[in-house]
Swiss-Prot record:
Subcellular location: Cytoplasm
Function: Serine hydrolase involved in the detoxification of formaldehyde.
EC number, as in UniProt: 3.1.2.12
Catalytic activity: S-formylglutathione + H2O = formate + glutathione + H(+)
Similarity comment: Belongs to the esterase D family.
General remark: Present with 1750 molecules/cell in log phase SD medium.
Domain of life of the native organism: Eukaryota
Protein name according to UniProt: S-formylglutathione hydrolase
Enzyme class: hydrolase
GO biological process entries: formaldehyde catabolic process
pH-activity dependence text: Optimum pH is 7.
Organism per entry: Saccharomyces cerevisiae (strain ATCC 204508 / S288c) (Baker's yeast)
Length: 299
């Protein structure tokens, strides 16, 4: 893992990194914001800074949210690091959408492990996000016994659009092992098996077999996962989102949790006048940051 660039932001530093991934068999870029606490000389040696992983949406790179969502102010306020991974493998050798569209292929990896060629060789994004990347960051930053950042245990996950889907899916798939302390999402795709974006991705990456789709669909996963304690999923979506009715359909998640142990623990806030942009995301980042900070034990 090598440092590409560093920027002073708020009270901390945004670091742009690249590394060779065993999961995707490509070079991957990732941004991380280290809050002011990381650089404080009086930071307790026995304390570790928790991490929030933010998964971006279709077409995005690690730069979009790190430049436009304004997470850094909240990271400094509460004391967590935030990781901005890429949305897919990239490169001339990486298969892309044969139609040249922006909703599949490079920039649209859907955070799953592809089983269909020519995508299976590189599009192993589930393993990359939830297994390899946290371990790689831990090895890079926590050297020589100087362990200040927690990428493995006290961790939360969130995301926007395709990334909101990826956050909920990863949270649910790792729920029994308590992989993430909390999950939230901005305008997520909640039922990919039943909307055009998701169907295109699932057919291309997973094939026609619906049993494979079920392993990555939050509305199907959540029915078979028993809720514990007071764990909640927080979701915001704008009522002026142009993708709301065709691709997002948040009401399908509420229908899926009816009469399950999750029924009272999925909160979807539909906010008036907001669209799908980072104007929407940045407006509600403070509420999501507080939600995660509470679950990470920071407040």
């Amino acid at each position: 893992m090598k440092v590409v660039k560093e920027f002073s932001v708020c009270g901390g530093r945004l670091i742009k990194l690249s590394h060779n991934s065993n999961s995707t068999k490509t070079s991957m870029n990732v941004n991380i914001y280290l809050p002011k606490h990381y650089y404080a000389q009086d930071f307790p040696r026995n304390k570790r800074i928790p991490t929030v992983f933010y998964l971006s949406g279709l077409t995005c790179t690690p730069d979009n949210a790190s430049e436009k969502a304004f997470w850094q102010f909240q990271a400094d306020k509460y004391g967590f690091a935030i990781v901005f991974p890429d949305t897919s493998p990239r490169g001339d050798e990486v298969a892309n959408d044969p139609e040249g569209s922006w909703d599949f292929g490079q920039g649209a990896g859907f955070y799953l492990n592809a089983t269909q060629e020519p995508y299976a060789q590189h599009y192993q994004m589930y393993d990359y996000i939830h297994k390899e990347l946290p371990q790689t960051l831990d090895s890079h930053f926590n050297k020589n016994g100087d362990v200040k950042l927690d990428f493995l245990d006290n961790v939360a996950i969130t995301g926007h659009s395709m990334g909101g889907y990826g956050a909920i899916c990863g949270y649910l798939k790792g729920y029994s092992g308590k992989r993430y302390k909390s999950c939230s999402a901005f305008a997520p795709i909640v039922n990919p098996s039943n909307v055009p974006w998701g169907q295109k991705a699932f057919k291309g990456y997973l094939g026609e077999e619906k049993a494979q789709w079920e392993a990555y669909d939050p509305c199907l996963l959540i029915k078979n996962i028993r809720h514990v304690g007071d764990d909640r999923i927080l979701i915001h979506v704008g009522d002026s989102d142009p993708f709301l009715e065709e691709h997002l359909k948040p009401e399908l998640l509420l229908e899926a949790v009816k009469a399950t142990s999750w029924q009272d623990y999925v909160e979807i806030k539909k906010v008036h006048g907001f669209d799908h942009s980072y104007y929407f995301v940045s407006t509600f980042v403070p509420e999501h940051a507080e939600f995660h900070a509470r679950n990470l034990g920071l407040i």
